[in-house]
């Protein structure tokens, strides 16, 4: 997801704008297909938690957290560039961001 945010930020922003405007086009898919997909994936994570492979967490909200961490790099790339400077779009800067997001995810999951 973060790679997509770097590679296609305009597509990510288009989706975000659709959501911010009430999701009139995609709302039926969000309520059905996305809801079902998240529930299925959350059940898998819940199973891993029950086996002691992951730290206890709200697995549905875990997806929101990952989405927000990755979506930010597309939706707020101008803000990020202003804070980080001109090299924010470099491969090194993108790798730094990816490494940070992954460390956060591992930490949430208790896998660090």
Locations of regions flagged by a protein language model:
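Short, conserved alpha-helical segments within structured domains
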Residues: 22, 58-62
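Short, solvent-exposed amphipathic helices
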Residues: 29-33
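Amphipathic alpha-helical segments used for helix-helix packing
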Residues: 6-28, 76-84
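A local structural micro-motif
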Residues: 13, 56-57
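C-terminal peripheral helix-coil segments that are non-catalytic and often amphipathic
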Residues: 3-7, 35, 39-53, 59, ...
């Amino acid at each position: 997801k973060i790679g997509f945010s770097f590679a296609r930020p305009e597509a990510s922003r288009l989706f975000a704008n659709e959501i911010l405007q009430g999701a009139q086009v995609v709302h039926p898919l969000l309520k059905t297909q996305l809801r079902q997909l998240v529930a299925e994936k959350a059940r898998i994570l819940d199973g891993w938690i029950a086996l002691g492979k992951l730290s206890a967490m709200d697995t549905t909200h875990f997806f929101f957290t990952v989405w927000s961490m990755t979506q930010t790099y597309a939706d707020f790339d101008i803000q990020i560039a202003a804070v980080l400077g001109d090299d924010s779009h470099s491969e090194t800067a993108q790798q730094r961001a990816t490494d940070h997001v992954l460390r956060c995810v591992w930490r949430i999951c208790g896998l660090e």
